[in-house]
UniProtKB/Swiss-Prot annotation:
Enzyme Commission identifier(s): 2.7.1.39
Role of this protein: Catalyzes the ATP-dependent phosphorylation of L-homoserine to L-homoserine phosphate.
Designated name of the protein: Homoserine kinase
GO terms of molecular function: ATP binding; homoserine kinase activity
Pathway(s) it belongs to: Amino-acid biosynthesis; L-threonine biosynthesis; L-threonine from L-aspartate: step 4/5
Family per record: Belongs to the GHMP kinase family. Homoserine kinase subfamily.
Subcellular location(s) per record: Cytoplasm
Amino acid sequence: MSERLKLKVPASTANLGVGFDSIGLALNKFLYVEAEISDDQKWHFHHKGENLHDLPTDENHLIYQVVQFLEKRFEVTVPPLKITMRSEIPLARGLGSSASALVAGIYLADFFGQLQLSEFEMVEAATEIEGHPDNVAPVIYGGMVSGFYNNHTNETYISFIEPPRVNLVITVPSYELKTHDSRQVLPDSFKHGDAVQYSAISNTMLSALIQHDYVLAGKLMEMDGFHEPFRQKLIPEFEKVKSIAKEYKAYATVISGAGPTILTLIDPSKSGKLVRRLNKELDECSSEIIIINKSGIIAEKVYE
């Protein structure tokens, strides 16, 4: 009897302005993966659709590298796999495409390597690879997650937050922005007083979210000093999107992850009007309402 694993892996958005490298939301765009043991003892990757056409099909593939990491860490052997993938998540746009692939690799290693990892152990492994849990944790659990990775002790801490009861609008530019390039513009250090202020803003923003005070939360989201002032310069559409969103009383407009996607939080009654306006005025971008994913990754075992 042959066995296959089918994965439906959500996208994610990270930071929400002031939650740099620590807050993330799962989103209803998906990476679909099907895998089975290869007949010829070789790894095979087949990519469907435009979003994945530039990915490698050899040992440079992220999923292969993640499986190799898990094999070494847990001292198991995963048989070579035949993997088919298609994705609704655009690459290098700040919507967690690499985190989705990373988590998929962990699930494949867990299933075909018979590791029996818990969800939290998967988060730990993903965070060790990624360096922070803001994307990978919501991909696994769904919803909204805050977290911290102590790279001195190799410990991961996460906490769950009720997702905001707002609509999310994403504006996706036509160009890519690699996370590495987006991090290159960030300063190496901050003055102590500035860091204290930015941390206080982040703490207060989370408290406002928990209290469903989206006006206050949104105002604070736009007060980040850790990354947004530097990354906005790489996204020429940002200020225009933010200005238009304010006309519709949006709670906040921030950069999704490392960008260039722009995320707007808005009252559901105004989100459709905003999307139509943005699509009318920004020819080189695509705007849409996107739903918060609350289930996380879905894995289905198929036996034939």
